[in-house]
A protein has these predicted regions:
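C-terminal edge-of-domain segments
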Residues: 105-254
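Catalytic micro-motifs at enzyme active sites that drive phosphoryl/nucleotidyl and oxygen chemistry
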Residues: 9, 30-34, 74-80, 116-121
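A general structural signal for short secondary-structure junctions and capping/turn motifs
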Residues: 11-14, 58-61, 79-80, 120-124, ...
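Short, surface-exposed beta-edge/turn micro-motifs
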Residues: 17-20, 41-42, 64-66, 126-129, ...
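Short hydrophobic-aromatic micro-motifs
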Residues: 42-48, 69, 89, 94, ...
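An N-terminal domain-cap segment
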Residues: 1-59
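Short, structured beta-strand-loop surface elements
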Residues: 50-113, 216-218
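Coil-to-beta-strand transition motifs
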Residues: 29, 40-44, 84-86, 203, ...
């Protein structure tokens, strides 16, 4: 395999999504500071407790309302087009019963200690906790759009490097342009005339964005085999660079 599955890409996007909105017919899209995939195949989301969306869901009761959660995965560097991918989750949005809120907050906080959780069901409550029962999931990026079954989504895991990816890409862009240039040497000649930027990094390879007068082009450089730790990642990048020193003290650190 030379690239993550769509389900893996969605799980990684869920883990690092820099922006998420939830939309319901007749109401302006609402920011959701918490959007957490639960093991039962639903999403826990928070919405402003004093907003129209919270009131609409409360009025609907057990029936809930049809809603779409949109998560945006932004590049961690200043690209001309910063959005790397979008994920849309459609389903029924319902309130979480008061008796279940505390337990669910603890469950979310165990893996995602989001500060917004402290503002749910508290003395200074700003957000209401809701559950989105998934009916469909679609992801889109520069290669196209694809739907994913909920079972596949639950079976997948985020990329092991997704929590560190932003810092690494920023480091490559600001301090190691020589590494980016070496990677760019693997691109077709026509693409090398554009400005090459680091776009993504995962266990399967490196993605580059080429910004040119003719538009943007995303190119993936796969590793020879997937890697699972920082040592393997560093070695795989050196192989892509064509570095002759793959081991020992003379190996370049990236």
């Amino acid at each position: 395999m030379t690239a993550p599955t769509t389900a893996e890409r969605i799980r990684s996007a869920c883990a690092r999504a820099g922006g998420a909105m939830i939309a319901v017919d007749g109401i302006d899209p609402t920011t959701t500071p918490v959007h957490h995939l639960l093991c039962d195949g639903s999403f826990a989301v928070t919405v402003p407790s004093a907003g129209r969306l919270a009131a609409s869901v409360a009025t609907a009761g057990a029936a809930g309302v049809q809603a779409v959660l949109e998560m945006t995965d932004y590049a961690p560097i200043a690209l001309r087009e910063p959005v790397r991918s979008l994920v849309w989750v459609q389903g029924r949005l319902r309130e979480v019963a008061d008796r279940d809120v505390s337990e669910l907050l603890d469950l979310i906080a165990a893996s995602d200690p989001n500060p917004a959780l402290l503002q749910v069901h508290s003395d200074e409550s700003r957000y209401a906790l809701m559950r989105l029962e998934i009916e469909s999931v679609v992801a889109a990026d520069s290669t196209g759009a694809e739907s994913v079954a909920v079972g596949d989504l639950l079976a997948a895991r985020p990329d092991p490097f997704c929590a560190m990816e932003s810092c690494w890409l920023q480091h490559l862009e600001s301090d190691h342009r020589d590494v980016v240039d070496r990677l760019a040497n693997r691109l077709p000649g026509a693409l090398r005339r554009g400005r090459v930027r680091p776009l993504g990094l995962d266990r399967y390879g490196v993605a580059l964005r080429v910004e040119s007068d003719g538009g943007d082009h995303d190119v993936r450089l796969p590793f020879a085999a997937p890697v699972d730790d920082v040592t393997g990642l560093s070695r795989a990048i050196r192989v892509l660079m064509g570095c002759p020193f793959l081991n020992g003290l003379r190996a370049r650190r990236v």
